[in-house]
Amino acid sequence: MSVGADRKKTGTSLTGKVVAAYGRHFEVEVAGGTIYSCVVRGKKKGVVCGDEVEILPATGDQGIIETTLPRTSLFYRSEIFREKLIAANATQLVFVLAVVPSCNLELLDRCLVAAESQGIRPLILLNKIDLIGQDEQRQAVAHHLMFYRELGYPVLEISAKISVQPLIPLLSGQTSLLAGQSGVGKSTLLNALVPRAQQATAEISDALDSGRHTTTHVRLFHFDADSSIIDSPGFQEFGLQQLDEASLARGFIEFRPFLGQCKFRDCRHIAEPGCKLLLAAQEGMLNSRRIACYHKLVKGLKKSHPWMETNKRV
C-alpha cells in the first residue's frame, strides 16, 4: 500500500506551497491560507520546503502531495553517498556568520558556490557584532568582510539582539533562505523578524516529540505580502558532489574572467602549464585561500568518482 493510501480522498486537486518539511510529513499552504498536513503519494521523493505542489485533499486537514511543480532553484548539499535537500525556489541566500563562533570561511565559500550554481542571490550577514572585542579581532573580521565586499557580494553587519532594522529592506520581495553553521544566532534573528517563529518551531517539536526546540527541520515564514523567509537547521559541513568541475570553477565569481583563457581547453586549474587561473594567483590577482578551497572541492570530486584522474600536461 502506498504512503497515504489509507487517507480518504475528497474533492479536486489544489495548488499550494510547502511551508514546512519534517521527515516524511509536510505542511502545504493553499490559497486563502489554509494549511494541509500532507504526505507524498507512493515512493515519490524530493519534496522540499518552498516547493510549489499539487495536493489532493483528504479527510479534514489531511492531504496527499501528487505533483511537484517546476522549480526556479534548489539549494542543497551533497556528500559522496547521500544528499540533503534544503529549500526550493529561494531567490536569496542569507548566509549568517557570527563573531562567536568564529567565521567559517570555507563553509561560506561552499554555500556561495552552491548559490551561484542555482542563480540565487547571496547576502552575507555578520551577526553578534556587539561581541566584537579586541582590536585584533575587529581587524580580522573587517578584513574578511572587505574581501567579500570587493568581490561584489552585499555584506551587512548587525546584532540581532539589538536591531534587525537594517536587514528588513534587503528582504523585501525576496524568498530568503537563512543558512549558516550552528550557533551563529539564526533563531534569534528569525524571532526578531517573525515574532511567531519561536511558537511555530515549538509546535512542530512538540508534535514530533523531539524534546527540543532548536531548528531541526525547514520551515517557511511569510515576512510580508511579497516576502518570505525559509529557516534551515545549522550545519558544519557542506558537500558539493552535485557539481562538476566547470560549475565549481564558475561558482568562484572572481575566477570567471580567467576561465576559457588557459593554454588547454580542458584545463582543470590544478597544476597544468599555461593555466591563466594559477598565473593570476601567482601574481596576487586571486586569493590563495579561495584557490585552495577550489582545489579541495575538486579533490573531493575525485574521491567520489575514482575514474577521474588529473590530466598531465607537458
Swiss-Prot record:
One of its GO terms (molecular function) is rRNA binding. SUPFAM superfamilies: Nucleic acid-binding proteins, P-loop containing nucleoside triphosphate hydrolases. It comes from the Bacteria. Residues 78-238 form the CP-type G domain. InterPro entries: G_CP_dom (IPR030378), NA-bd_OB-fold (IPR012340), P-loop_NTPase (IPR027417), Ribosome_biogen_GTPase_RsgA (IPR004881), RsgA_GTPase_dom (IPR010914), RsgA_N (IPR031944). One of its GO terms (cellular component) is cytoplasm. Zn(2+) binds at residues 262, 267, 269, 275. It is found in: Cytoplasm. One of its GO terms (biological process) is ribosomal small subunit biogenesis. Binds 1 zinc ion per subunit. Its cofactor is Zn(2+). PROSITE patterns: ENGC_GTPASE (PS50936), G_CP (PS51721). Its EC number is 3.6.1.-. GTP binds at residues 127-130, 180-188. It holds the Pfam family RsgA_GTPase. One of several proteins that assist in the late maturation steps of the functional core of the 30S ribosomal subunit. Helps release RbfA from mature subunits. May play a role in the assembly of ribosomal proteins into the subunit. Circularly permuted GTPase that catalyzes slow GTP hydrolysis, GTPase activity is stimulated by the 30S ribosomal subunit. Belongs to the TRAFAC class YlqF/YawG GTPase family. RsgA subfamily. Monomer. Associates with 30S ribosomal subunit, binds 16S rRNA. This is Small ribosomal subunit biogenesis GTPase RsgA. It comes from Nitrosomonas europaea (strain ATCC 19718 / CIP 103999 / KCTC 2705 / NBRC 14298). The gene is rsgA.
